[in-house]
Structures are given as structure tokens and as C-alpha cells.
């Protein structure tokens, strides 16, 4: 975080010296990254608050809320300012004296930033690969439940692409003597931030609303329930992520007609223990005892609830 802030300051100083709109946008980009990390750290801290009477399921969704804010506020603001800087520079490019542009300053700052951002990107990619397992990249992002993993990777990827765009824009300006390329680079960086913002908002929105657990987890829970002797049929397995490591489960189960109340109670305890042992991220389980029906038309059946 401090590294990004330091890079942002250096980029802004370079932009003041050289008059480069692309470098100005890169400074904004690094400042955006810094604010991004501050909000994500705050969200992680808030999400670890314990459950209370007011928030019985805890604060796990705080991380989803702040990740969504990162996408909407920071990236969107960064995109808007970068595009504005590029358009402004494009319209007033004759005000810049090309003889005063110190390209060595720009290239030095970009080289340092590329090395530092490259290291951060490699670490983020390594962590993301470890988390995604055998899933593809897009599938892992779409089905991922911890936004901090893919937000950081997206942020660092956008930063690397932005640096290359800035380099190309400044290089073309140096070769041609036309400042329009530097201005266009600034606009492209803004569009890159905007695209990143839209994609992150799309992915975090569904988490904020409430996504189900991954298909393998749901199928695994169904198999555990179906394997218990007293269970005649598993009607429904409903899950929702209350946080990256917090799954709430609601089961609709048809117990065998001959089952006694004590048998059902023991079965519920067994299910609770087995499911939580297999999937530690499952924190709360609610079980409804319902007869098997062709279509579920009512929620007025008797309910037996298991909580922990």
C-alpha cells in the first residue's frame, strides 16, 4: 500500500516535470490502487466482527460491500479523471512545449513502476492460481467467494497494462513529435480503469446479493444427507454465502414415516456434525422436515431447526 502511494507521488512529480498526460493518468491509477487497498483492508477488518443480537449471522458480507464500493467509486472516479486529463490534453496539446519534455524522466519512472508492479502482479497471480485449483480463470472469478483474491489480481493486471500503454504513448510522442499519442494513452488508461470497474462491479454484485455455495459443495451436502438411514428423500439443499468462509445451509428433508421424534433429533445432530466436518465453512444449518411432494406449494410445513 505504501509502495503504491510512493509510486503515485513519483508519477505525479514526473507528470509535472514532463507535462505528460499519460504519466498523470498513471499517477491517478496508482492513487486508485492505494485507496483500493485501504478499503479492502477496512472491509476485511469489519467482516471479522463477531455475530451479535443485531447481526446474528455476523458481518461477513462487509467485504462484499466494500469490494463493490472499490469497483464503483474508486475505479470509476479514476477512470473519469484519467479520461478527462486525456481529453483536456488532446484539446490543449499545443500548449505543451515538446522541447521541455524530459523523456528520460518518464522512462525511468515507468521502468521502476514496471518492476515493482510486476513483482506484485506475479505474487497476486500465484495466490489466485493456488485458490482457483482446477477451475479456469474466468470460472474461478465468476464462482469465487472471496473478492479480495480476484480484485487484487485485476488491479495489478490493469496496472501492468496501463504502464505499457503509457510507455507506448510517450514513445510515439517522442518519435513523431506529436503529443496526441500521449493524450490518447491517457484516454486508453481511463477506459481500462472503466472496464475494470464494470467487470468488478458485475462480479461483486452477485456476492453482495447472496450467491449459493459452489456446485461441488451443494452436491456433497446432498450426498451426506441422502446417506443417512432415517432420510427418505432430500427435497432441497439451499445455501448462501454470508462471507467468504461462512456458508448458511437450509435443508428440506423427508424423513421416513416410521421415524420417531427422538430418531429425527438424532438424525439432525448427525447431519449437523457430518456436514460441518466435511465442509468447515458451513457455520449454520437449518433443517425443515417436509413430506416429499411433486411440487412445493407451501411453506407451512412443520419445521425442525438445527443451529450452531
Predicted regions and their residues:
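Peripheral (non-transmembrane) domains and long loops of multi-pass membrane proteins
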Residues: 200-308
